[in-house]
């Protein structure tokens, strides 16, 4: 199994590469790519960690050598948020980066599963889909927007509030991956109940958690370490499913039946070909139904922005 990380010299990329080097199954290959010249050195640094995961690093304009034979490609390349920016301010720079990298994936490893981490995910996934479609290699079961950070944050905040072990809590999060489009389904957490005020406060905290980190880092960056962990969790789940493990479920932002929007984050059963089954979002509370209705315009606009970027 070969995993390629594009944007591997950045804050998320390095954290992700470290976790994959220590946690990928024995015999896996890990390939790191970034435009930055430091990237082969990041691979050398990680190669000293004693795990049976082969690692190589590549830098420069051409990602092809890193992509050859890749089964999973995780894309974290792009600029990070600064205070006062929201994820959509990133669009102007990151849209071009994602388009370029996905074009290279389409040429070199068109059958790979692709996880898009680069923000704004609501839009960059639509860009990736249109690029793959133009290249004639789009498979909607193999393109994912990685929203796992919303899930791990939800799990952490709920566990803190309710005095649970974080490992015992799994909150499904649906919708998109920024602001109001992030909808944690708190009504579906088994064995935990919330007051209306708790639901409102938690939902808001989960939606604004990225900003919490950006502000706390005082201009020094955005959420890189928790995002690295989230991306590793998603990437490792995908690898296990591709290798035939049964019953692997993760939420991610994918193209579905279009009931709510063309792309929508929901629980997915993963399998040997990527998405095996898009699972139902279940029964929503009145608060959740309302929040879902209220986000769809924003989500659809975000998606249209990505489609137009490629097709203009």
UniProtKB/Swiss-Prot annotation:
One Pfam family, short name: Ldh_1_N
Residues holding NAD(+): 7-13, 34, 94, 117-119, 227
E.C. designation(s): 1.1.1.37
GO molecular function terms listed in the Swiss-Prot or TrEMBL record: L-malate dehydrogenase (NAD+) activity
GO biological process entries: malate metabolic process; tricarboxylic acid cycle
Binding residue positions for substrate: 81, 87, 119, 153
Stated name of the protein: Malate dehydrogenase
Organism: Escherichia coli O17:K52:H18 (strain UMN026 / ExPEC)
Organism lineage string: Bacteria, Pseudomonadati, Pseudomonadota, Gammaproteobacteria, Enterobacterales
